[in-house]
Amino acid sequence: MIALGIDPGSRRCGYGVVAREGTRLVVVASGVLAPRAERPVAERLARILDGLAEVIRRAGPAECSIEQVFSGASVRSALVLGQARGVALAAAAQAGLPVFEYAPSEVKLAFTGSGRATKDQMIRTAHMLLGATPGLSDEADALALAVCHLARRAGRLAVPAVRNVAVSVPGVAGRARPLALPPARERAALAAARLRPSRRDHRGLA
């Protein structure tokens, strides 16, 4: 199974595509879509939509995961995030991908073993667990979303080895190295695996 994680934003949108092959996790593609900041919001969102559509077309994920909206954001931040989330949901819907939502703490728990992981810890875990080297937390968060969803789907997460596959997105390289998942993190993944999706969208392309 191949899962797409999206960390939406109007200035930067992280994406991570991870495949589960038996007991292996494979980073198919990951990166950050970052339109020029001086462009109008509508144009930035349109470019992100096009970029996500291209990622989906090339990487071929079966399902999509995204973070739930948290209530601590300011009104302005919530409005901007809502616009970016709408673009991410639209990209998934256009490709016929079901969308699953997870709370930020649930994603962090499944990925790092701690529901309060910092941005730096998320980036380090992406390198340790997947061999990826995300330059920004947006990319690490997107990879974490994909891994969290795969954990929930599998019911457990054991990773004796990871490797790359041929599918890629221009300008993005996924790297991996063998790594066994510690028991504590596997228990965290099992907890995340019991989560249920709060949103699904089954619309496909016309």
UniProtKB/Swiss-Prot annotation:
Q: Which cofactor does it need?
A: Mg(2+)
Residue ranges annotated as coiled coil are none
Entries under InterPro entries matching the protein: RNaseH-like_sf, RNaseH_sf, X-over_junc_endoDNase_RuvC
GO biological process terms, alphabetically, are:
DNA recombination; DNA repair
Q: Which residues are annotated as active site?
A: D7, E67, D138
Q: What SUPFAM superfamilies has UniProt attached to this entry?
A: Ribonuclease H-like (SSF53098)
Cited CDD domains: RuvC
Q: How is the cofactor bound?
A: Binds 2 Mg(2+) ion per subunit.
Q: Where does Mg(2+) 2 bind?
A: E67
- Tell me where on the tree of life, at the top rank, the source sits: Bacteria
Q: Got a GO cellular component term for this one?
A: Holliday junction resolvase complex
Q: Where in the cell is it found?
A: Cytoplasm
UniProt keyword annotations, A-Z: Cytoplasm, DNA damage, DNA recombination, DNA repair, DNA-binding, Endonuclease, Hydrolase, Magnesium, Metal-binding, Nuclease
Q: What does this protein do?
A: The RuvA-RuvB-RuvC complex processes Holliday junction (HJ) DNA during genetic recombination and DNA repair. Endonuclease that resolves HJ intermediates. Cleaves cruciform DNA by making single-stranded nicks across the HJ at symmetrical positions within the homologous arms, yielding a 5'-phosphate and a 3'-hydroxyl group; requires a central core of homology in the junction. The consensus cleavage sequence is 5'-(A/T)TT(C/G)-3'. Cleavage occurs on the 3'-side of the TT dinucleotide at the point of strand exchange.
Name this polypeptide is given: Crossover junction endodeoxyribonuclease RuvC
Give the species.
Answer: Anaeromyxobacter sp. (strain Fw109-5)
